[in-house]
A protein has these predicted regions:
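Short, solvent-exposed positions on alpha-helices
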Residues: 130-138
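Aromatic/histidine-rich interaction motifs
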Residues: 96-119
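N-terminal regulatory/effector-sensing and dimerization cores
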Residues: 7-101, 133
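Basic, amphipathic alpha-helical hairpins
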Residues: 120-131, 144-156, 168-179
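Polybasic "coupling" helices that flank or enter modular domains
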Residues: 138-141, 156-164
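Amphipathic, well-ordered alpha-helical segments in soluble domains
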Residues: 11, 34-37, 90, 113-117, ...
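A short, N-terminal "cap"/entry segment at the start of jelly-roll beta-barrel domains
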Residues: 1-11, 105, 124-127, 131, ...
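N-terminal positioning helix adjacent to the helix-turn-helix/winged-helix DNA-binding module
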Residues: 110-113, 161-169
Length: 179
């Protein structure tokens, strides 16, 4: 689904799961940071002259405007993915958060959390209709902080970005839940 546009510092521009992935060729890349993760099947991602095999659970965050292409790779014709693109006032500064240039690969051993996050957000939107723009924005910071944590080794709640952005936002949301 495509969440509503907002004035938040960070939000999801598009998000999806259980997506039967068609071949994609982007000679000029994509204009936003783009997460893609294999749910089922196997994909082949080509970027910067490198081929990355995306097995179930593997995911990758691709920086904006990085030429890339991806397609199903295991011969089944059935490559299912989840995806997330980021937008908002801080979207151009995500390289500072994730230190991604031009991509960050996440192996299946670390990927389950990201899949569960996407499933949870989609479930909250479609089945419960209980996610608002503020909650989605906080969730996007959480998602990116978790990615950044893979590079730094800090726990999620110790990460400086969590302390600076997520904790205050969560406190603000919690203080207004009864409103």
């Amino acid at each position: 689904f495509k969440p509503s546009a907002s004035d938040f510092s960070l939000s999801a521009d598009s998000i999806g799961n259980r997506w039967l992935q068609e071949p994609v060729v982007r000679p000029n890349g994509f204009p936003l940071y783009h997460w893609i993760q294999t749910e089922r099947g196997e994909g082949l991602l080509t970027l910067e002259g490198q081929e990355l095999l995306l097995k179930p659970g593997d995911g990758v965050l691709i920086a904006p405007h990085v030429p890339h292409e991806y397609r199903e790779n295991d011969g089944s014709g059935m490559w299912f993915t989840s995806f997330l693109t980021f937008d908002g006032k801080l979207s151009d500064d995500l390289y500072k958060i994730c230190a991604v240039s031009p991509y960050l690969f996440v192996p299946a051993s670390e990927g389950a959390w990201f899949q569960e996050w996407i499933d949870r957000i989609i479930d909250s939107h479609f089945l419960k209709n209980d996610i608002d723009d503020a909650t989605l924005s906080v969730g996007c910071f959480e998602f990116l902080t978790r990615l950044s944590q893979l590079r730094t080794g800090l726990s999620r709640t110790e990460h400086p970005l969590y302390l600076q952005y997520v904790r205050p936002a969560m406190q603000e949301i919690e203080s207004h839940l009864s409103d």
